[in-house]
Structures are given as structure tokens and as C-alpha cells.
């Protein structure tokens, strides 16, 4: 899948209604922008951004890892939708199972190179970015 094909469609970035420090959830409920639910959604969004940065720096021979990371981004997006109570989105156990499977695949591919060692982020720009993600 081409990296440019993975973009999500967004209708608008502004509601033009003002906010007084509040925002609306998908179900219409108003919450403070510094509420726990918005903190969690913001953290998931930040994680997705870091994963996207890692994807952007992957070389062509890492297509299977790119597919896994792209699926993780999609899962984070859906999890955020569940958290803000979007009624049309359900985060299924299958997605959590897939996340565990992806982790196992990545661990197997790296076996022997890191297990049992304390890891320091860095070494390469991509490794440092993956450490942040």
C-alpha cells in the first residue's frame, strides 16, 4: 500500500463556534479540554504521530513492518473514537489480539539482538524515533 493512500479524510479542522475551554465529544457531550478523556485522546494522537514519523523513515525493505505499524495507527484511531463515544465505531477484541500478534512478530524478528538487554534509545535517527513512539 502506498504511503499516500493511507490518509484519513477529515471534514473540517475548525467548528467556528468558539470553545470557552471546552470541546465536544462524538456524542455531542461538552467536556473541558483538560479533561481526562481529552488527555487520553491527545496521548493516543501523539503516539500515532510518532508511529507515522517512524513509518515515513522506514526503508523500502521494511514493508511488513510498515504494514504492522500502519495497522497499529488505524487501531489507535479507532480506540480514540471509542473513547470519545462514537456510536458507529466498536474497538473489537480482534484488534487487541492483532496488536499482540504484531508485537510477537516484531519481537521474533528482533530475537537475539535485544532480549535480556537494557535498551537505550538511539543509535540511528529511526531507532530514536521508534523509542519515542
Task: Annotate each language-model stretch with its function.
Residues 2-133:
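Phosphate/pyrophosphate-binding loop motifs in nucleotide- or prenyl diphosphate-using proteins
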Amino acid at each position: 500500500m502506498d504511503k499516500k493512500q493511507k490518509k484519513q479524510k477529515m471534514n473540517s479542522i475548525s467548528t467556528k463556534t468558539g470553545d470557552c475551554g471546552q470541546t465536544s465529544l462524538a456524542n455531542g457531550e461538552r467536556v473541558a479540554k483538560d479533561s481526562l478523556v481529552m488527555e487520553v485522546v491527545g496521548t493516543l494522537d501523539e503516539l500515532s504521530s510518532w508511529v507515522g514519523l517512524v513509518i515515513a523513515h522506514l526503508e523500502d525493505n521494511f514493508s511488513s513492518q510498515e504494514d504492522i505499524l500502519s495497522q497499529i495507527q488505524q487501531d489507535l484511531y479507532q480506540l480514540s473514537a471509542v473513547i470519545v463515544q462514537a456510536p458507529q465505531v466498536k474497538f473489537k477484541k480482534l484488534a487487541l489480539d492483532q496488536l499482540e500478534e504484531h508485537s510477537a512478530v516484531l519481537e521474533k524478528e528482533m530475537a537475539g539482538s535485544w532480549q535480556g538487554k537494557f535498551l537505550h534509545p538511539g543509535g540511528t535517527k529511526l531507532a530514536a524515533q521508534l523509542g519515542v513512539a
